[in-house]
């Protein structure tokens, strides 16, 4: 599973953990998250995230 980091605020989306607070189940791949989803911390869109190596 991959991780994606917001380039604005640094918040990290981990595919393995999902984001249940927004209804995104653990194991949800980045490409399966709706395009209108926004960063929970700063509100930017998915285009402002980059895949990171951890």
UniProtKB/Swiss-Prot annotation:
Induction: Constitutively expressed.
GO biological process, one term: alkane catabolic process
Domain Rubredoxin-like: start-end pairs: 1-54
Keyword Cytoplasm part of the UniProt annotation: yes
Binding site for Fe cation: 6, 9, 39, 42
Cofactor(s) required, per the database record: Fe(3+)
Family annotation (Pfam families): Rubredoxin
SUPFAM superfamilies per record: Rubredoxin-like
Keywords: Cytoplasm, Electron transport, Iron, Metal-binding, Transport
Subcellular location: Cytoplasm
Biological role: Involved in the hydrocarbon hydroxylating system, which transfers electrons from NADH to rubredoxin reductase and then through rubredoxin to alkane 1 monooxygenase.
Family the entry assigns: Belongs to the rubredoxin family.
The protein, known as: Rubredoxin
């Amino acid at each position: 599973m991959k991780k994606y980091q917001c380039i604005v605020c640094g918040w990290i989306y981990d595919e393995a953990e999902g984001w249940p607070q927004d209804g995104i189940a653990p194991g949800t791949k980045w490409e399966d998250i709706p395009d209108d989803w926004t960063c929970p911390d700063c509100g930017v869109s998915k285009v402002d995230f980059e895949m990171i190596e951890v």
